[in-house]
């Protein structure tokens, strides 16, 4: 499995972020020649010491000339574009920067691919939030795109720009977009995100603020999500344009639970790991919502299951256990178990 990445030149935009750091490390275990493009270093990437193993170009993705320069120099076989301003709340406080990074940044990558005639394969990572909220139980790739909030709309723009560039200029380039659920796992310290906020609070023996406790999300384990990206890339290598287009990568319906439920399960497992009483400090205060969010969000990954043979290996219980265990090892033993979890995942 995933043998096609051996000795391939892989360029990851956003390689130092949460998903990017896991993907970078996984690809190094597959003996790929990995290169990165990011505007700064993030904690998990530093903890993994990846900067000493992977050449990363530290530039702003909004700089078209630098994007062109790097693609020309690397001459990648495949690009994974994970760069983003990914925080919904920040899209409200600074919408212009959100659109500059997400939309113009993607436009620059596409333009560089067009003018540099590289690479052969490109995967652009968007989000499950691109779908128009129609009250469906689960959205398929063919459903109408929407984007009520600013972040979601920026990702819809990306889907449309990628599709337009493909039709207008890049007929000979293999391109796909990936729409994944709420991805969780160890090593995420993003601001205003549920798991990082919870872990920071637990480590300080404080309560945290929880908004919209009854809203349902498709919670996906980090390695399940990334395995989908990697399998899609491999199929594009092997079978070409029949694997282009949009792809959902989400969990089983049983793993789509409310934020309240995932918090309670996390508290239960964290209590067991730390041998503490739940009422010692674990808990949260409800935060009044200040911006729009979809109440129920689920995506249908039938296409990936049937055509790629992909399916999540972890249910929501396993996902929470693996995530809490990563943070427990970090906060209690100062140990980084990312590589161990990748190896264990591959054995399942």
Sequence positions of predicted segments:
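C-terminal substrate-binding subdomain of Rossmann-fold SDR/epimerase-dehydratase oxidoreductases
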Residues: 29-32, 202-348
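Short, solvent-exposed loop/turn segments at secondary-structure boundaries
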Residues: 93-94, 150, 187-190, 293-295
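Amphipathic alpha-helical segments in well-structured domains
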Residues: 106, 191-195, 229, 263
């Amino acid at each position: 499995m995933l043998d096609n990445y051996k000795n391939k030149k892989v360029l990851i935009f956003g390689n130092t972020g949460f998903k990017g750091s896991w993907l970078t490390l996984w690809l190094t275990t597959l003996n790929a020649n990995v290169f990165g493009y990011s505007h700064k270093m993030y904690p998990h990437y530093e903890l993994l010491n990846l900067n000493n193993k992977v050449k990363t170009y530290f530039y702003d993705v909004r700089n078209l000339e630098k994007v062109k320069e790097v693609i020309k120099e690397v001459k990648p076989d495949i690009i994974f574009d994970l760069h983003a301003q990914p925080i919904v709340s920040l899209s409200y406080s600074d919408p212009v920067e959100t659109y500059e990074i997400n939309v113009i940044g993607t436009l620059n990558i596409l333009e560089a691919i067009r003018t540099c005639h590289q690479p052969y394969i490109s995967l652009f990572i968007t989000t499950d939030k691109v779908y128009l909220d129609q009250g469906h139980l689960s959205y398929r790739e063919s459903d109408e795109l929407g984007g009520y909030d600013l972040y979601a709309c920026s990702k819809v723009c990306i889907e449309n720009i990628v599709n337009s560039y493909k039709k207008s200029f890049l007929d000979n380039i293999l391109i796909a977009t990936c729409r994944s659920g709420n991805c969780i796992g160890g090593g995420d310290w993003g601001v205003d995100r549920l798991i990082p906020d919870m872990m920071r609070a637990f480590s300080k023996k404080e309560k945290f603020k929880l908004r919209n406790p009854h809203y349902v999300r498709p919670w996906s384990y980090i390695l399940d999500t990334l395995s989908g990206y990697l399998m899609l890339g491999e199929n594009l290598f092997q079978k070409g344009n029949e694997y282009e287009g949009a792809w959902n990568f989400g969990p089983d319906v049983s793993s789509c639970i409310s934020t309240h439920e995932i918090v309670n399960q996390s508290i239960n497992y964290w209590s067991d790991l730390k041998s503490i009483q739940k009422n010692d400090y674990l808990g949260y205060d409800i935060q009044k919502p200040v911006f729009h969010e979809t109440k129920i969000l689920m995506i249908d990954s039938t296409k990936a299951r049937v055509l790629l043979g992909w399916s999540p290996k972890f249910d929501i219980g396993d996902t929470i256990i693996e995530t809490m265990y990563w943070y427990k090892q970090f906060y209690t033993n100062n140990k980084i178990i990312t590589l161990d979890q990748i190896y264990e995942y591959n054995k399942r």
